[in-house]
Amino acid sequence: MDYLVQSVPSKSGLASPERYREDVVEEPLTERGRRSRERIVDAAAALVAERGAGGARLDQILEAAGASKSQLYHYFSDKEDLVRAVIARRVGETVHCQGPQLDKVDSLAALRRWFDWLVDQNAERDCPGCPLGALASELADCDEAARGDLTCGFDTWIGYVIEGIERMKVSGELDERADPRRLGVAVFASLQGGLLLSKTYKDPQYLRDALDATYDHFLSLRAHHPGAPKRPPG
């Protein structure tokens, strides 16, 4: 089953899916069937978050979902297929959460607000790390289909960042040295690294430090004109 739309080339050079699908091609036809499938994906997502894809056993997933083996194999061909549905779920959640925030990024001040929002969210949730980053670390070397889904999801997320940087450049806040694609990848790498360190140390300051350093680099690329924003204290 295919969980993702085909990636298409974008001006950024990254694959840029027009829309990330959480449904499968062979979607259940009945409302009851959709609810059954959702319960299985919900249970799988929770157990994968707790134990990893390798540690989440099918019998545990079925027990948590209150579903039978026949229901599982009606909707999913095997465990790998179910894990791909979990990836689709996590990417969908990320796009739903991050997209509206990133759509507002059109200036250095707006970028600072997004960075601060990320740090606040991370601290409020006790530094849980990134679910997609955790899945990528576990699956990228052993499941090619899952790796493809994860790269598609990452491209979608990075694409939002790149679009924001492009808006900043068009508005004249960033000078000609600013490369939206490279900066977008750098922002994403800082975010992922900061989330991982914050999770490991259980200290949100690591994410703040990573994003502050990234923001300082953006400030070095700002166009020099009156009123250009400065890095806020703290």
Question: What positions do the PLM features span?
Answer:
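Amphipathic C-terminal alpha-helical segment
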Residues: 121, 167, 188-205, 217-227
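N-terminal intrinsically disordered/low-complexity leader segments
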Residues: 1-35, 224-234
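Hydrophobic alpha-helical connector segments
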Residues: 85, 98-128, 180-187
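Amphipathic alpha-helical segments used for helix-helix packing
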Residues: 109-110, 124-145
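Short, basic, alpha-helical segments at the C-terminal edge of helix-turn-helix-like DNA-binding modules
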Residues: 88-94
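Hydrophobic alpha-helical bundle segments that form small-molecule/ligand-binding pockets
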Residues: 142-144, 155-183, 218-231
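Helix-turn-helix
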Residues: 39, 43, 47-81, 85
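Hydrophobic alpha-helical segments that form the core
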Residues: 2-4, 133, 178-197, 213-217
